[in-house]
Design a protein with these regions (language model features):
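Conserved N-terminal Rossmann-fold NAD(P) cofactor-binding segment
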Residues: 27-69, 83, 302, 306-313
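Rossmann-like NAD(P)-binding element
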Residues: 50-111
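N-terminal Rossmann-fold NAD(P) dinucleotide-binding loop
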Residues: 12-13
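Conserved S-adenosyl-L-methionine
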Residues: 21-27, 131-134
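Rossmann-like NAD(P)(H) cofactor-binding subdomain of soluble oxidoreductases
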Residues: 85-151
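C-terminal substrate-binding/catalytic lobe of Rossmann-fold NAD(P)-dependent dehydrogenases
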Residues: 130-136, 145-316
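Glycine-rich Rossmann-fold phosphate-binding loop(s) that bind the pyrophosphate
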Residues: 8-9
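Short, small-residue-biased leader/transition segments that mark boundaries at the very start
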Residues: 1-4
Length: 316
């Protein structure tokens, strides 16, 4: 199988729908605690896929995971209005820990792609608790935040998002760090391009844009109750990069023994994504304030990971 989303909820269904029309993806299996829901989603998505690539989409069980290239874990409670991703930890940790155990029994060599929040904690649990190699336990991390950053910049500058190279690092959440110092458009530093184009970006606008990116999910959920298509698109894009061995660069989250003096954390940094999962992360040059913010973000996640591991051990 190419990809097996675990959970046929809003995010899993959106990801599966997009994967069904992704070049190179021919086989998708949905696994859910509610088999009828998974079967219904699989049939509906399969009918849509028949218009294009005709990828095979079906409902299955953990036994069907054997040989899967990628297993995408989206199961868990969703973010409620006013709730932070880290506050979801206690609700989702036991669910994802149990799923991870079942997946590894059936497919010990698969790549685990986590989309369940808090998405930066789950890869660390897989590495520290289940011994998964860091490059094969991947969180979608700040992939979506980076896209939101580029989208916001592209609208302001009136250029295509594909011409904007800008990344968000750290936590997929409130402590994330927008990398202004390394952002470029057309080979020019972002702020130089903005100035020359007559659309300058001053400190006040930077703060506004950063807040827009950071709170995008909260606004979406306040309006429609769920954020699913953006993250579904990220999942599909990452799976495509893995299955196709693209070696494309994305800001995903992986477990790090040490970062900027912080031990045993898991944050988003640029990684090369291909058939074997995620490469060793790359730490880009940082301005002093960006380094300070990234260190603080890494510390928040290190403490959360330690607390999550302790909670699982206490329940054992």
């Amino acid at each position: 199988h190419d990809a097996l989303p675990i959970c046929a909820g809003q995010v899993g269904a959106a990801a599966s729908y997009l994967l069904s029309s992704t070049p190179g993806i021919s086989d998708i299996v949905l696994v859910d605690v509610d088999p009828a829901r998974a079967a219904g989603e699989a049939a509906d998505i399969g009918h849509a896929a028949a218009f294009g690539t005709a990828a095979r989409v079906q409902e299955g069980s953990y036994a069907d995971l054997a040989g899967a290239a990628v297993v995408v874990i989206t199961a868990g409670a969703s973010l409620k209005p006013g709730q932070t991703r880290l506050e979801l930890l206690q609700q989702n940790l036991r669910i994802v820990d149990h799923i991870t155990e079942q997946v590894l029994r059936a497919a010990p060599d698969t790549i685990l792609l986590f989309a369940t929040n808090p998405v930066d904690v789950m890869p660390a649990i897989a590495v520290q608790r289940w011994g998964v190699a860091p490059g094969r336990a991947i969180g979608t991390g700040c992939t979506l935040d980076s896209i939101r950053f580029r989208d916001r910049l592209s609208h302001h500058l009136e250029v295509s998002p594909s011409s904007v190279h800008a990344y968000v690092l750290g936590e997929h959440g409130d402590s994330e760090v927008l990398l202004w110092s390394g952002a470029q458009v057309g080979g020019l530093p972002l702020l130089d391009f903005a100035q020359q184009s007559g659309r300058p970006i001053d400190a006040a606008l930077q703060r506004t844009m950063a807040e827009d990116v950071r709170t995008a999910a909260y606004r979406i959920k306040a309006g429609k109750g769920v954020s699913n298509f953006g993250i579904g698109g990220c999942i599909a894009r990452l799976v495509r990069a893995m299955v196709g061995d693209e070696r494309s660069v994305f800001t995903v989250s992986t477990y790090l023994p040490e970062l900027l003096g912080v031990q045993r954390t898991c944050v988003s940094l640029p990684h090369v994504i291909g058939r074997t999962g995620a490469s060793t992360p790359y730490l880009p040059p940082l301005a002093d304030d960006e380094a300070t913010a990234l260190r603080a973000s890494a510390e928040v996640l290190a403490q959360t990971i330690a607390g999550g591991l302790q909670a699982l051990e206490d329940r054992a």
